[in-house]
Amino acid sequence: MDQLLPPAPLLDAARFELAIRRLADSLGHGTDRSMFRGAGQEYEQSRPYQAGDAVKAIDWRITARTGRLHVKEYEALRRVPVWLLVDTSASMTVGSRRPTKYEAAVCTAGGLALACLGRMRPVGCIGVGGRSLVVRPTLSRLATLGWLHRLRRYRLDEPTDFAASARLLEPLIAERSLVIVLSDLHDPTAAARLARIAQEHDVCLLVFRDPAERGLGAGILRAREAETGRALTTTGRFPTRRAEERLAALRGAGIDGLVLDTDRPSTARLRLFFSRRRPLAGRRP
């Protein structure tokens, strides 16, 4: 049975849109050299001056070194598309407190999407779970808000199928793209598939973590896994390091990422993370 994300912190539809717009403004501020950069120009080389060249294009450093006028040539950058892979599985929707991992992921996806649109970067989305959600990258704000509102609905029994979602994505990406994955990495098949995608595209990973996954108090803990129903018994003092361990393993495949705890502010960390990433056009294929 489908359920709607609870009233707070996403509130109603209008307040949900307001929240992600504010996040988009915060993420986009001061990050023009990061993932949010879209169309523009990139320096390619300098060549000798020719009659008719603009004075503002003169490369004064090369001119001073050679004694001959040189001008800079620039290469136009394409509008590199962005794909958001949002984990919609049951493990994302269950948490020890609000917001859940899923609530945080949907809000973050919304902020990233609108920030990219503000920089003229087309954005698409694929739901990583049992539902059918595939939206090709677009510059349409209306279409983007449409799939964001679809993400507000969730199921408590939805499985993860990262492998199937990745197989679906691969033939859809005809050109080099930026792929941002928002997940808790509970699916063990995710690492291999992401490594394969990273061979052709720029991939980064945002891992959402519930406070309980950092470790509980003393004592024995009995629990049941939300998606598979598998029961387990563990000690509360043992912190869950799965997110960091899997993220560290993926770095070897050229995938960088960030662990986001749902009980801690994330906007500043996200802004810093993306501002420090090299633009996709400068990353090695």
Go through each PLM region and give its residues.
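Exposed, interaction-prone extracellular/peripheral surfaces
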Residues: 1-35, 43-53, 62, 67, ...
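N-terminal juxtadomain amphipathic helix
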Residues: 55-57
